[in-house]
């Protein structure tokens, strides 16, 4: 078995895919209407956005984590684009920030 990618459910896959493409510095791959993919480099899990008419309550049991060399600057950049900070976290060996994208999906930025 191999990883195919990470699918994010959304009411508007075109808008959310465009936001993530800009956030990650990648291009939109394919737009099939109900499914939009990103062109991702080999070191990034393929991302796709799937249209659901009704988004289930209690979602976000799984979320992506992204590494960054400058946690504060990257957090500021994403907030300026429409992300929301949920919580800043510091553990003995790791520093990270939990955010939501404009659609309310959780993700973490982790200091390298």
Where are the model-predicted features located?
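Vicinal oxygen chelate
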Residues: 1-10, 22, 27-30, 37-39, 54-77, 95-100, ...
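Hydrophobic ligand-binding cavity/cleft-lining segments
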Residues: 11, 16
